């Protein structure tokens, strides 16, 4: 359910080779594979060779040109239809159906799904890549201001199972059968407390779906460690720990330890980040933490800024004008 690649990668050669090896291993075992492009992917690049790959039962979503066509599979319970829906923006949907009232991401997804209702007599699986309202995010992910890119989980009600990509934490949204698989590894320290897993879904007769998960344990975990320099360099404390893990260490010493990073790396070679938590740093952080960006609308952000600059709130007319500008700018960005 993607992302297949991460946009920030400067050299994707290794990633491309790894994907090639992985798909080949699955195809050699006669296992069908379904893949879509995400918001960090180039849909055109992911779709390259899609028609040829189908001969090996590797099904890749084409560039979005309209409602997805179901890919039928058959087993002892009958037909199972798989729908591949790559990452969508409202402008992409307006281009296909210009007469449809599509302004938001929710409108866009609702429009597409109206044009591909699943056969109620068949079991159906949707593979998609969108942010579903109510799902938990972390710092590794791009979060839009005001949650403007979110979609409602109820749009998926007609499908027996929905396999979602986009968010890094494995989780269900709305119901057990609408799930983000999450990432196989932790990509930032905001994910340190997440438990990565693989999700196994078995679709029996129509309406019967069983889900089990298996933990994914990496060779080196990503962890946060806290304590004084003396505590963290005490052999009795670290002797039985995984010192080769990727670590974010927070020292609680009131005085900075000279050359602490290099000295700690003698014990913890994969130390990636070092911070202090003491009276000095807490005083530096007395500014009240802002609310999460996705809980505040663009107009609320601008209104707060205007209040700070002018010592008075926006008038109703000013607020209405600002909201109109925001909507026009957002629409222009989607059409770009």
List each model region and its residues.
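Short, small-residue-biased leader/transition segments that mark boundaries at the very start
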Residues: 1-5
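His/Asp/Glu-rich metal-coordinating catalytic cores
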Residues: 11, 28, 41-174
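A short helix->loop->beta-strand "cap" motif at the edges of active sites that frequently abuts
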Residues: 26-33
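Generic beta-sheet signal
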Residues: 33, 124-128, 245-247
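A conserved active-site cap/scaffold subdomain adjacent to cofactor or substrate pockets
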Residues: 161, 165-216
């Amino acid at each position: 359910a993607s992302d297949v690649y991460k946009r920030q990668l400067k050299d994707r050669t290794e990633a491309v080779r790894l994907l090639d090896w992985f798909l080949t291993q699955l195809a050699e075992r006669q296992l069908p594979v379904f893949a879509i492009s995400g918001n960090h992917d180039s849909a055109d690049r992911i779709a390259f060779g899609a028609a040829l790959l189908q001969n090996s039962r590797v099904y890749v979503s084409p560039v979005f040109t309209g409602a997805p066509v179901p890919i039928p599979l058959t087993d002892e319970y009958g037909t199972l239809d798989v729908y591949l829906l790559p990452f969508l923006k409202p402008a992409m949907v307006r281009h296909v159906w210009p007469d449809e009232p599509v302004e938001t991401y929710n409108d866009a997804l609702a429009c597409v799904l109206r044009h591909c209702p699943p056969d109620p007599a068949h079991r159906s699986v949707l593979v998609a890549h969108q942010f579903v309202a109510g799902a938990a995010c972390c710092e590794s992910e791009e979060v839009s201001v005001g949650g403007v890119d979110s979609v409602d989980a109820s749009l998926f009600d007609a499908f027996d199972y929905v396999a979602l990509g986009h968010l890094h934490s494995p989780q269900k949204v709305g119901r057990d059968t609408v799930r983000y698989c999450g990432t196989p590894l932790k990509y930032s320290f905001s994910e340190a407390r997440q438990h990565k897993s693989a999700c196994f879904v078995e679709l029996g007769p129509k309406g019967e779906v069983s889900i089990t998960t298996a933990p994914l344990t990496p060779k080196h975990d990503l962890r946060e460690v806290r304590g004084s320099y003396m505590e963290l360099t005490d052999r009795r404390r670290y002797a039985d720990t995984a010192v080769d893990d990727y670590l974010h260490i927070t020292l609680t010493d009131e005085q900075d330890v000279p050359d602490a990073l290099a000295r700690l790396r003698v014990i913890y070679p994969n130390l990636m980040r070092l911070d202090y938590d003491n009276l000095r740093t807490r005083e530096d952080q007395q500014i009240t933490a802002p609310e999460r960006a996705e809980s505040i609308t663009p107009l609320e952000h601008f209104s707060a800024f205007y209040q700070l600059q002018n010592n008075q709130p926006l008038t109703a007319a000013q607020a209405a004008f600002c909201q109109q500008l925001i909507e026009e700018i957002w629409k222009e960005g989607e059409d770009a």
